[in-house]
Amino acid sequence: MTQPGQTTTTSHEAIDAFKRIVGDEHVLTSERATMPFSKGYRFGGGPVFAVVRPGTLVEMWRALQVSVDNNLIVIPQASNTGLTGGSGPGFQDYDRPIVIISTHRIDEVHLINDAREAISLAGTPLTHLTDALAKHQREPHSVIGSTSIGASVIGGIANNSGGSQIRKGPAFTREAIFARVNDDGKVELVNHLGISLGDDPEVALDRLQRGEWSPEDVTPAPEDSNETEYAEHLRKIVPSPARYNANPEYLFEASGSAGKLMVFAVRTRTFPREVHPTVFYIGTNNTHELEEIRRLFLEADMPLPISGEYMGRSAFDLAEKYGKDTFVFLKFMSPALQTRMFSFKTWANGLFSKIPGIGPTFADTVSQAMFSVLPNQLPKRMMEYRNRFEHHLLLTVSESQKAASEKMLKEFFAEPEHTGEFFICTSDEEKSASLNRFGAASAATRYAALKRRHIAGLIPIDVALRRDDWNWLEVLPEEIDDQLEVKAYYGHFFCHVMHQDYVAKQGVDLEALHDRIQHLLEERGAKLPAEHNYGRIYKLPESMEEHFKELDPTNTFNAGIGGTSPHKDWA
């Protein structure tokens, strides 16, 4: 059996073919050179035969043809965020060598229909799309969060990323252009982009990259709005989750494909940019008060808030201490610079990982030491609330909703049984609160990396709770709690999507503990995962496995995802 990193005569021929297509410098084969692509941000990592970095859609198409002709497993990768390890290989019993086709160099955006829609090519990062739309007073589906680690537009679509924008729902489109490998093992191009590009694959992809089409070649845009049908779906307080990765309503071709197709471009809606939103910072020691506020706003006869983000005190503290570098870069510099620094950190960690006594977290250790000398970066009122309240909610509303929302909150907290408080953020407090909330995920990862010699590891849980669940914040049994060093809770509260990070004590069986926590959540009617997809840590349900088999009948793409067979033809 050929292992992922092994080579054969045929494999050498494939390397030569890749080099003819993309150039020698864009075909990586050494362990050090491929590690930034093969090792995930949190999970995943294993040997690969090669990383190929095409610079055009046509090169991408040709590299795929070579891979299929040489019986290689193909992992399409736009941005190796690897939150659950799904953007790279795992340590599985693969029967073919693995090639990662990294699309990072293909990052163009084409705005169409008066910027009401965007065509994002294979490797377009969210930061590029955000910048392109800002000139037109528009914004994409995702506004902040995964943008800070360089996440891509297509990665969001492929994984049904939800994000903080509660009016918009999961990242989803029915319009994409992609390649699949059919039952006969042949590569075919499918153009469902809604743009006529011709029948020849290479001509079509070249025209797409150059934006060469006329207005009559493009189907009309949908009606403009600052929300999708998800908004009304979310308002229903019913015993089922609002959104989760296995929801069939959000699985269509590229959407939710999890790397089981080679996606060249997606067409997505854009939204009017929010001008002068208001952020209410809410603190309480009673979880039911936050749920009452959630239902109050969901049931109100007014537009939904823009976002409602939860953060517990433990997550707050982790973000303040271990996410300070991310906070500073994003607050005082730019997401684009943070993305470059993230890439540099990954490269540096890979470079120093083989040096005895240094290990795989060199860049994290240096960054943590440098930024720890800075004083606390958070505003005074936020720190006061941190000391007084266990639970924090960042409620963001449109300018037109400010007065009504403030009135609702004042009346709510005026009732004697309610013990929490709120304040309206200044512009500085608004930015700081948002960055601290979205720094929580990277902070938990940083903490676990720096403490790796003294802990068993990190268990991240990504869960969609029932929309009617009053007891949304779990209380773990003592026998589980005793196995944990740290636990942190944060999430998209109005959607009842929680991110729950657990750092397990040394000697704990991580897989068994993960399964136990997942079982407890599922007993409560929750669905896992919610928005980070299955990757290498969640087992696919049968319905998802059948869906992936329809997309990829020969198991050419991202084989082994979600605990499925890594073998050809799903053997």
Swiss-Prot record:
GO terms for cellular component: extrinsic component of cytoplasmic side of plasma membrane. Keywords: Cell membrane, FAD, Flavoprotein, Membrane, Oxidoreductase, Quinone. GO terms for molecular function: D-lactate dehydrogenase (cytochrome) activity; D-lactate dehydrogenase (quinone) activity; FAD binding; quinone binding. Pfam families: FAD_binding_4, Lact-deh-memb. SUPFAM superfamilies: FAD-binding/transporter-associated domain-like (SSF56176), FAD-linked oxidases, C-terminal domain (SSF55103). It is an enzyme of class 1 (oxidoreductase). Its EC number is 1.1.5.12. It is a peripheral membrane protein. FAD binds at A78, S79, N80, T81, G82, G86, S87, G145, S152, G162, V263. Optimum temperature is 45 degrees Celsius. Its cofactor is FAD. Its main location: membrane. Residues 44-273 form the FAD-binding PCMH-type domain. One of its GO terms (biological process) is respiratory electron transport chain. Catalyzes the oxidation of D-lactate to pyruvate. Also has weak activity with L-lactate and DL-2-hydroxybutyrate. Electrons derived from D-lactate oxidation enter the electron transport chain. Essential for growth with D-lactate as sole carbon and energy source. Belongs to the quinone-dependent D-lactate dehydrogenase family. This is Quinone-dependent D-lactate dehydrogenase.
